[in-house]
Amino acid sequence: MGEHPTIAIVTGIGTAQAHAATAQAATAQLLDTVKVEWVIVVGISGAIDNQTPIGTLVLPELVVSGADCSQYRPKPLRLGDAHGTLWTTDSLLVDPRVHADLRNRGVVSLDMETAAIAKVCEQRGVPWSVLRAVSDRASDGSVDAEILGLANPDGRANSPAAARYLLRHPGAWLRLVRLARGSKLASERAAEAAITAVS
């Protein structure tokens, strides 16, 4: 991008340690193979607050691993003021009490990969930043384990699984359309911000 040589890798999405390990392994392989000056984690996330608009850019001051509460501080980006905490978890968090507790801790958004990537970067002394855009809201019930299972590990839609899901739940097509639109908007917003960040 611009005058900066750029390498992009896809770590996919995750709901279990195996997927977090994949993000970790992909990052480690990249950093062990190529001299990298800076890693930017770009992707989508779920807002913890029902009032957060879809497409909102998330620039956290802190990333916390839900697995062991380890904390990572990203390098600030020139995209606006960083605020709040991004909580990385292998679990799909749907309990409103958990959401309230996380909000009280300053969590603004949830993802499934950033802490794993940050850990590798910090172990190797490579600066890193993160930007995410909100694709859905954790507290509105739009995503559950079955819905998350409609995506391939790389994040792309699994069309046969979606068709089977709609045969079982014919009234759910509006939910899927809303999620697809939210994911598309968030992905575009995150990509635009990433280009701006390195330009």
Say what each PLM segment does.
Residues 1-199:
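Glycine-rich phosphate- or other oxyanion-binding loops that anchor nucleotides, phosphorylated ligands
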